[in-house]
């Protein structure tokens, strides 16, 4: 049986067992998607990041939930950069080439990690009344962000107080 190098990282925190956990798996070559999904299912975290070094300037990066591949995962990307820097001993910035989100760059400064995300097109769309019913707060307007495999609706609310009053009905 092949051995895999795998790490679990709590993103967005300096405290153990806090933040947003993600697994990071370093691969020599890509495994079949069914195997990547099975590994993510066994990890039982929101996302598992899989990395393969490229011949050029970075890494190919893919993210899997316990059931499927997703087009983008911010916290697992940051976790991947931390593993490359702190566990493997490489120096940022890191360039991650993805299948559905373009190239992401992660850098590190004295204050922490930062990531450059792809620019997305925002178009009119979504039903404010429907989104308001789900969020449990008044929604002023909605916008649609088409992303291959992960379309998003943005809700505009009056202020931070409205956002803090949100009680989602999911």
Kindly give the residue locations of the regions a language model identified:
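Active-site proximal loop and beta-alpha junction motif in alpha/beta enzyme cores
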Residues: 1-73, 78-170
């Amino acid at each position: 049986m092949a051995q895999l190098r795998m790490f679990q990282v709590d993103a967005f925190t300096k405290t153990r067992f806090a933040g947003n956990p993600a697994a990071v798996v370093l691969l020599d070559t890509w495994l079949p998607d069914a195997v990547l999904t099975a590994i993510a299912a066994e990890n039982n975290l929101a996302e598992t990041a899989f990395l393969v070094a490229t011949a050029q300037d970075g890494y190919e990066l893919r993210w899997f939930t316990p059931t499927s591949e997703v087009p983008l995962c911010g916290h697992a990307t940051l976790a991947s950069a931390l593993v490359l820097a702190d566990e493997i001993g490489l120096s940022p910035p890191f360039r991650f080439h993805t299948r559905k989100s373009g190239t992401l760059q992660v850098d590190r400064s004295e204050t922490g990690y930062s990531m450059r995300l792809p620019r997305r097109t925002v178009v009119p769309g979504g039903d404010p009344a429907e989104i308001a019913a789900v969020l449990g707060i008044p929604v002023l307007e909605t916008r649609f962000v088409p992303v291959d495999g992960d379309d998003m609706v943005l809700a505009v609310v009056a202020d931070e107080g409205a956002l803090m009053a949100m009680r989602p009905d999911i």
